[in-house]
């Protein structure tokens, strides 16, 4: 039985919108920042690295992000100087996925040059592709690691 519901990330966006992420609503920007943080946490990376990546994206989008990161959860607030948007996100499981982690780090590193001209929905499409990367190791091997 699954006690966690999937997060409908694309529902945070207007699929027909042509607004670039840098001009999008705070809710849309916040959804990207939170999803990036959650995906990194799911790869097995530490809180410092998750927070650093979330801060990098927030800075590129001209907002402030304050995050409390645990082993399986993130509570964060994004502030644009006028409004704020807060969310609490949690994972139903964690693992080590170095392939996905490498892609996520590359995504964050190149965000400024490759994503600031994308819509929020286009960014979630890119994150969907990264999220579909499976671990190179079986659960048994991961358990022995």
Q: Where in the sequence are the language-model features?
A:
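Soluble N-terminal domains of membrane-associated systems
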Residues: 1-118
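Core alpha-helical transmembrane segments of integral membrane proteins
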Residues: 132-145
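Short, hydrophobic/aliphatic alpha-helical segments
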Residues: 32-35, 129-130, 145
């Amino acid at each position: 039985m699954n006690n966690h519901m999937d997060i409908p990330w694309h529902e945070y966006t207007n699929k027909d919108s042509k607004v670039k992420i840098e001009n999008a609503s705070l809710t849309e920007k916040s959804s990207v920042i939170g999803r990036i943080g959650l995906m990194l946490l799911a790869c097995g990376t530490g809180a410092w690295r998750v927070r650093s990546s979330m801060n990098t994206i927030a800075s590129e989008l001209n907002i402030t992000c304050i995050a409390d990161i645990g082993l399986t959860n993130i509570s964060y607030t994004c502030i644009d100087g006028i409004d704020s948007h807060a969310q609490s996100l949690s994972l139903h499981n964690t693992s080590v996925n170095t392939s996905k982690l490498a892609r996520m780090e590359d995504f964050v590193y190149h965000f400024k040059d490759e994503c600031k001209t994308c819509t929020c929905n286009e960014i979630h499409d890119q994150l969907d592709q990264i999220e579909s990367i499976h671990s190179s190791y079986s659960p048994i091997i991961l358990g022995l690691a």
